[in-house]
Amino acid sequence: MAEKEEKEPSKLKSSTGVSRPTISLPPRPFGEMFFSGGVGFSPGPMTLVSNLFSDPDEFKSFSQLLAGAMASPAAAAVAAAAVVATAHHQTPVSSVGDGGGSGGDVDPRFKQSRPTGLMITQPPGMFTVPPGLSPATLLDSPSFFGLFSPLQGTFGMTHQQALAQVTAQAVQGNNVHMQQSQQSEYPSSTQQQQQQQQQASLTEIPSFSSAPRSQIRASVQETSQGQRETSEISVFEHRSQPQNADKPADDGYNWRKYGQKQVKGSDFPRSYYKCTHPACPVKKKVERSLDGQVTEIIYKGQHNHELPQKRGNNNGSCKSSDIANQFQTSNSSLNKSKRDQETSQVTTTEQMSEASDSEEVGNAETSVGERHEDEPDPKRRNTEVRVSEPVASSHRTVTEPRIIVQTTSEVDLLDDGYRWRKYGQKVVKGNPYPRSYYKCTTPDCGVRKHVERAATDPKAVVTTYEGKHNHDVPAARTSSHQLRPNNQHNTSTVNFNHQQPVARLRLKEEQIT
């Protein structure tokens, strides 16, 4: 029995030795792995490269699996041990299933019982082409063309060696790409580190002081906030300057703006103001420069009331009184010669520089005409010199009269009892006869007149008087000039210190053409 038992294992061993299957693939040329059309099929370069890097088959052959496992040295040993284990495991399965049939048949369940060592999960492509490795560089590599070198023959390099070389090149390309990406990111990280170090150094600078950091930060915040508020205030003042430019300098009186006029060549209009005190006829005109600054203030008339006091602002009233005192001091020399005669009448010698003032049109009770805009320049310059008249006065104010006298005479200059000096002449548009300008020769008398002949009637002489005389009619020099009666209240006498003449003199409004 012992011999039989010894023979049976020997027979079993012999039978297993005969029926053991051999997993070996038929010899396959090396070039067939790059294309699936057979040996006679010659694909293009792109097809060759695509077949090299990807394989559509889900289950690889043993040679391809072994070649993929060779990419890592550790997997090679595991793959070798797995092949031996598969060979021993496959023998009883085939003998039981086939009853000791031919060893060429392999159980179809072989792929299901494949050891885990050979179950290599791979992406759709066998290799991932790195950014640094292109198909052109792969084709130009000497190792790729060495596969088909005539010196080595068709099988100069094995399948495993070729795949190992391509894998090494791919890994090297991946390493180069990773190094480049790290170098490109390195400067940004260093800059961030430098900024963090600078911030840390700035926060650590005040550590030597005795004050805590919270106080230092609070002081820094207050300083920055103060600078910001200062810049905002400067911007606000810069923006609000054009808005406040419409308000002239405060002279102590209350004014109400009643009109303005656009000046040619300037963005800022000419403003007209009137004193807000009841029954006060004082008005003023404010001229501005191109940048909005007040360049000239022209006053007309005198205040018949005292300087008003500011409500709840003592400083403002003091400033107003100081300004009024300055006006009085600067014009004290002009007031000395007039104070003796102001008890009976008060005259004003202020003249407007242009005739477009709207305040003169509204004074119908004392003015029957309009100011000529075409007066000569000497008169205008003299008028501007007289701008600074005293504004702080409690006397009664009398506005300037403007009277037009039209007579028929062969002589242009009529004898009205006063002495005149001619200071200019001008040709009026639409009138062939010139206009002559005269000024009273009495000192400190600002009365003027201009004489012209009517364009429609050459014998009609039009004489326009401006202002009132602040003196009596001077005595006649010779008897030849006694053309006027001695009675000053005669209706033929034009005397502006008393009642206005109403006899032969016809008053009319002057029409400027």
Swiss-Prot record:
Residues 1-26, 175-281, 297-394 are annotated as: Disordered. SUPFAM superfamilies: WRKY DNA-binding domain. In young, mature and senescent leaves. It is found in: Nucleus. Induction: By salicylic acid and during leaf senescence. Residues 244-308, 409-474 bind DNA. GO terms for molecular function: DNA-binding transcription factor activity; transcription cis-regulatory region binding. It comes from the Eukaryota. Transcription factor. Interacts specifically with the W box (5'-(T)TGAC[CT]-3'), a frequently occurring elicitor-responsive cis-acting element. This is Probable WRKY transcription factor 3. The lineage of its organism: Eukaryota, Viridiplantae, Streptophyta, Embryophyta, Tracheophyta. The gene is WRKY3.
